[in-house]
Amino acid sequence: MWLGLRLFHRPFSSLAARGLVYEKHGEPLQVLRLKNVNITHPADNEVRVKMLAAPINPSDINMVQGTYALLPQLPAVGGNEGVGVVVEIGRHVSSMRPGDWVVPVDAGLGTWCTEAVFSEDSLVRVPSDIPVAGAATVSVNPCTAYRLLSDFETLRPGDTIIQNASNSGVGQAVIQIATSLGITTINVVRDREDLSSLIQRLRDLGADHVITEEQLRKPEMKDLFKNCPRPRLALNCVGGKSTTEMLRHLDYGGTMVTYGGMSKQPVTVPVSALIFKNVKLCGFWVTQWKKERAQTDREEIVKMIRDLCDLIRRGKLVPPPSTQRPLEDFSRALQDSQTPFLSRKQILIM
């Protein structure tokens, strides 16, 4: 829960901030307003954070629209991800101090603001020697990619995975993390006018094979597996026909994990894949994973963020191409974030 939202009154002890507030669900450009909000000094287990940067993700849009699986109480400040610097701590806070960089690990906290007050256990420290854009975008897509590669199959150097939506934020993170582990990636993308430049960009990130949805359906796919083993793991963010085609190429006993449904089409599984190939089907939602681990093993969240930041520091995990805009220019950023085939991440600078 975002703890600093005070829209109508400003007590003597409160502090002024600005945030993108919505009082009802709807299209972001219609319901979001940049407003002055009031935040209080932190209580014993709270932290006041000056936000530095916060991206616009599809889940942020869905939350404002009211279609996401987790919805904050209204009125609310938008944004689930970002990086900020600690400016004040409550007297019982022990894991961070003023000057530390922090990122949220809970969803629905409201990061599209200049300052906010969060509970200590909803934040994790990150190093301040990595790029702001990397820190601001580390806690959603890279965390999803990290868990997809860690939790469903025991992957070793030389193994292969296949994924669709490979140019998405998660897809790009999967490519880079897999490359750092010596895992071969087969990356499926939609055909488009700038296909050659997209293929080159993904190869620059470490992609071994980049193919289109149409190529995925062709018999010539068998030639690809002369040079690499069939994938043990398939990562699905699309659904529909793309899912069925990836399943055809999955190795015996392999696993397909669905973490999104961009096509809004159901996952269709041939009976033969279940009976004769013994494939396993799973779903994954990083928000739920974090919620469960926060209660049982918070150190696993901290380790994941630490590992990802180390990859960023070593240049093995770069954030997606981005356009950074001041908070006041949020309308342009929101519009561009929903433009098809515009692959640049929109990041709000506070």
Curated annotation (Swiss-Prot):
Catalytic residues, chain numbering: 68 (proton donor)
Subunit structure: Homodimer.
Protein name in UniProt: Enoyl-[acyl-carrier-protein] reductase, mitochondrial
Transit peptide, residues from-to: 1-12
Principal place of residence: mitochondrion
InterPro entries linked: ADH-like_C, ADH-like_N, GroES-like_sf, Mito_Enoyl-ACP_Reductase, NAD(P)-bd_dom_sf, PKS_ER
Domain of life (superkingdom): Eukaryota
Family, similarity comment: Belongs to the zinc-containing alcohol dehydrogenase family. Quinone oxidoreductase subfamily.
Gene Ontology biological process: fatty acid biosynthetic process; pronephric nephron tubule development
The organism's taxonomic lineage, starting at the top: Eukaryota, Metazoa, Chordata, Craniata, Vertebrata
Organism: Xenopus tropicalis
